[in-house]
């Protein structure tokens, strides 16, 4: 069974570059304080790294 990580959007997407918004939408984060549970894969880790200043991560 793969590991899961919880990602929460803690800062708004307003006035952020389009690339950051697309990454957040790709992870399923659309509203402030929304939490999603994702599989811990290198792809997801890369997405989290791009928007690390906007999200909170719990393993």
Swiss-Prot record:
Keywords: Ribonucleoprotein, Ribosomal protein. The keyword Ribosomal protein applies. CDD domains: Ribosomal_L30. One of its GO terms (molecular function) is structural constituent of ribosome. GO terms for cellular component: cytosolic large ribosomal subunit. InterPro entries: Ribo_uL30_ferredoxin-like_sf, Ribosomal_uL30_bac-type, Ribosomal_uL30_ferredoxin-like. Pfam families: Ribosomal_L30. Part of the 50S ribosomal subunit. PANTHER family: LARGE RIBOSOMAL SUBUNIT PROTEIN UL30M, MITOCHONDRIAL RIBOSOMAL PROTEIN L30. Belongs to the universal ribosomal protein uL30 family. This is Large ribosomal subunit protein uL30.
């Amino acid at each position: 069974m793969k590991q899961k990580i919880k990602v929460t959007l803690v800062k708004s997407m307003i006035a952020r570059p389009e690339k950051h918004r697309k990454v957040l939408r790709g992870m399923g984060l659309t509203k402030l304080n929304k939490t999603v549970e994702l599989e811990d894969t290198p792809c997801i880790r890369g997405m989290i790294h791009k928007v690390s200043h906007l999200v909170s991560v719990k393993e």
